[in-house]
Structures are given as C-alpha cells and as structure tokens.
Design a protein with these regions (language model features):
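Radical SAM [4Fe-4S] cluster-binding motif and immediate context
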Residues: 26, 176-349, 369
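Radical SAM enzyme core and accessory elements
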Residues: 1-8, 18-20, 40-45, 62-71, ...
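Conserved strand-turn element in the central/C-terminal portion of the radical SAM core barrel
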Residues: 54, 286, 313-325, 338-363, ...
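Catalytic cores of alpha/beta
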Residues: 113-117, 294, 358-373
Length: 473
C-alpha cells in the first residue's frame, strides 16, 4: 500500500460548545507534528481538518473524507469527543474501500477495553505521545501493505497492554507550520503587555511532569509520564525563529510544567538573550519551582506572562491535592512569587479550583481571599473534575460510574458534588469569585492601565473576555 494520501482529523467537541466561560482552542499539537513529518515524504499528500475551530457534523466529516479519498486517516479525539469519533469510525468502516483508521488522543483512556479494535473499527490505536511512533507504524504500512497482520498484531498487543508511547528524542521532531488562517483560529485570549495585534505561536519545549497532583490526568496534558524529556535550548530557539518567519509575534509554551526542568529554563533564556531575541513569550509554571533570579532571567529573555496554578487558599486542600513540596506554607509561597512578578513586570494568570473533595464553603472563601490579595492580571476558576487516569478518578470511580464521564469538563457545571457544598452553591460561588475579583475599582483601573493598548489592537480578545459576564446570570 502506498498510503500516498493522509487525512489528519480532530473531531468536533460536543461538550464545551455551551460552556458559559471564555475559552480558546489550542492547535492539535500531535496532528501538527504528524503533518510536519508527513510533509517530508515527497509522494504523500497531507490534509488536516480541525473540527474544533470549524465544527461540523459526523455526516459532514464523512463527506469531507469522501472528497479527499485518503488512504489513511488519523483521528484525534479527547475524552468528551469519544462518541463522535466512534460514530465517524464506524461509518467509515462500512465503506467498500475503507481507508486505514488510526486512533490517537485521550478518548482512548476512558475505557481501555479492546472492543473497538476487536470489532475492526480502528486498525491501530496509539496511546500516549504518537509523534514519533506513528512514523514507525506508517513506514511498516507502506512497506508491508494494509493487510499485513504483523503490524496489526503488534499494535493491538501494545493497546491491550496499555502501552504509552513517548517522544524520547524531541529534538528530532519536525517543526510544525501554520497557515495564516490557522494562526487566526488559534488566538489565545490572555491579555499581555504587548501593544500590537498579537499573532500567537505555540511550542512544546519539555515533555513529562515529575509531580503527582491528584487531579492531574493525561486527558488534560500535552505529554505523558513523570520522566522529563527536554529539547535543547538551541532547537527551541530555532523553532521560535521558524514561527516568527510565519508571522508569529508572541509565543506560548504549552508544556505541562515549563519550570520543572529549571536547568533547561535557564539554558533557554540564556540562548534567547545571546540571540538578542525580541520574541515575547508566556508559559505555565509552578510557584514552588521559581526564585527571583530565575524570574529575572526569564524577564530578560522575553517572558511577558506566566500562568500559575495557585489552586486553593486552603493549606489543607493543597496538601490533599499533593501539591505541597516546599517547606513554606503554600499561601505564603504564592504571595512571595506574585510579589516578585509584580516587581519584575511579568504579567500573571492565576488558576484556581473549587469544589475539591471535602472542601467547605469557608475554604472556598479562603481561596477567594487569597486571589484578591495576589492581584494577578487575570484569573481562571475551574470546577474540580476527576478525569480518567488521575488518582482522583480512581478514588471516586464509584461515584463517577453513575454518570457519563465523557460529559465531564472543568468549565461546565459539575455532574456531582465531592465538596461539602452543593452543586448549586458551587456554581453561585464561582460567579461570586469572578464578581468580587473583577468588580473591584482597583482591578479595573490597574488592568486597563496595563492592557489598554493591547485591547485597542486586539478588540476581538476584549469582546471574548467580556463573555465572562454569562457566568453572572
């Protein structure tokens, strides 16, 4: 089989379309890496269809596939896309000359029985990070043919055993490229102190996360495992320049924990300073992995914003989450780090979680009080959601089994209450959280002083963020 035409498909999300919280869509990172690698085959035509940014029905997906007539389709689906993906795959397999169907994505962690493969729906499913393993599979298909049993048996066995594939040599991955339309579709909604229309580019510099937060799951991560696998600083800086040539003028590192490998962060910042890089960037970091010297170097290297998981103002809840590693009490550690970022002029987005197991109303009030004290530029308040693969999922699976896990989403109204607060009151508390944070006179004045020029050039983002008012209903 030549496999000369490949369709890369991210199926439509069916849960978050009615969520009342502002959000934006990340690129389908794994598919973009596959696209970049496949484009190096001179005889292969690659098509990418992202139904997250262009939502279409299963019937429309089938029609698009019929128009392309690919030899192979890679279907990427998240936990809340599982049914859509299964419907598409089942329909494709009914065709007389069905293409090979390869499944990737977190939906396959939900219920890892082998029903789909045994019923010949998918020809193979790659758990974990498919960006390198896919090409071993692809080369076998091209060399041995679609009907070869050896590669099928191998990948069936890997799936049955729950084997997660990992990118062990990230420097060898090809750099993804983006069309102008894609760059427009994947615009982040974070306000940054950049006085021009921003064109966001996205990178994954490190893979893995050494921490063991109870709520963390591969379903919501971009990588797997605790083993850190960092790219070289030069390779990352090269990709930033690659993105800049495509029109990108600000980068976002999407690593699960950008600060986990502090030696890498230091080397990357030194590389960017040595190149006299003018590219501003942001990343998600942990408060217990930062010090003033590292933050100052990050600022010098172009860092304009950091996303920090504060999570809770209750020390008990933080310890229950298994986030506490530093001897200093968590709230005090947060106060110190946010003071440093203000001194250095680095913007901050703080993440909070309410509805934690056994959490009381008083502890949620402690979280709101800490948020008001930290004074981050923006906040995101999530509902506690035990996704598949997390320790929380295992602990509460008897409760979860009574509900449709594919419908769980951390921005959506919880399906069940694990806190000592009712679901109705949790929804009200989240609304109060945002109201009390946003409607302070000091917040409005400070925020607009810092970001007025940004909003002038990025009015679409301003209007997107105003969507938060839906929560106040």
């Amino acid at each position: 089989m030549e496999a000369s035409s490949v369709l890369l498909l991210r199926v439509s999300s069916v849960v978050d379309k009615d969520v009342d919280h502002p959000q934006f869509f990340d690129p389908p990172y794994a598919l973009k890496y596959l696209q970049a690698g496949l484009q190096k085959y001179p005889d292969v035509t690659v098509h990418l269809l992202d139904c997250w940014v262009h939502p279409i029905t299963v019937s429309d997906m089938l029609a698009r596939a019929e128009g392309i007539r690919p030899d192979l389709i890679v279907i990427s689906s998240s936990s809340f896309d599982a049914q859509v993906a299964n419907d598409f795959v089942a329909s494709m397999k009914q065709q007389q000359e069905a293409p090979l169907l390869i499944g990737i994505g977190q939906s396959h962690y939900l219920d890892r029985d082998v029903r789909n493969i045994h019923e010949k729906d998918y020809d193979a499913i790659l758990l974990g990070e498919p960006e390198q393993e896919f090409f071993r599979l692809f080369d076998q298909i091209r060399a041995r043919g679609a009907g070869d049993g050896e590669w099928r048996e191998h990948y069936l066995r890997c799936y049955e055993q729950g084997q997660r594939f990992a990118v062990e040599e990230p420097d060898r991955l090809s750099f993804p490229s983006y069309t102008p339309e894609e760059l427009e579709s994947y615009r982040s909604i974070f306000p940054v102190q950049v006085p021009k229309r921003v064109v966001w580019g996205y990178l994954i510099a490190t893979r893995g996360c050494p921490h063991g937060c109870v709520f963390c799951s591969e379903v919501m991560r971009v990588s797997i495992g605790r083993k850190m696998r960092s790219r070289s600083a030069a390779n990352v800086a090269d990709e930033m320049e690659h993105l800049e040539r495509q029109g990108v003028n600000i980068c976002s590192f999407q690593d699960d924990s950008f600060s986990a490998d502090q030696r890498f962060v230091k080397s990357l910042c030194e590389e960017l300073v040595a190149r006299d890089s003018k590219m501003p960037w942001m990343a998600r970091v942990r408060v217990d992995e930062l010090d003033y010297e590292l933050l100052a170097l990050m600022k010098q290297a172009g860092c304009v914003m950091l996303g920090l998981g504060v999570e809770s103002g209750s020390q008990r809840i933080i310890e229950q989450m298994q986030k506490q590693r530093h001897p200093k009490p968590w709230p005090d550690l947060c106060r110190q780090v946010f003071q440093w970022t203000r001194q250095l002029g680095i913007g901050t987005n703080a993440y909070y979680v309410i509805g934690n197991p056994t959490e009381t109303r008083e502890e949620i009030e402690q979280t709101i009080a800490l948020a008001l004290e930290l004074k981050s530029d923006t906040i995101q308040v999530h509902f506690y959601t035990p996704y598949p693969g997390s320790m929380a999922w295992e602990k509460h699976k008897d409760v979860i089994a009574q509900h449709d896990a594919t419908q769980m989403f951390h921005y959506a109204t919880p399906m069940f209450a694990l806190a000592d607060v009712s679901i109705e009151d949790l929804v009200k508390l989240r609304s109060q959280f945002y109201r009390r944070y946003i409607f302070r006179a000091s917040f409005g004045l400070t925020h607009m002083r810092k970001h007025a020029a940004f909003y002038w050039h990025n009015r679409d983002i301003f209007w997107s963020l105003l969507g938060i008012r839906k929560i106040f209903r």
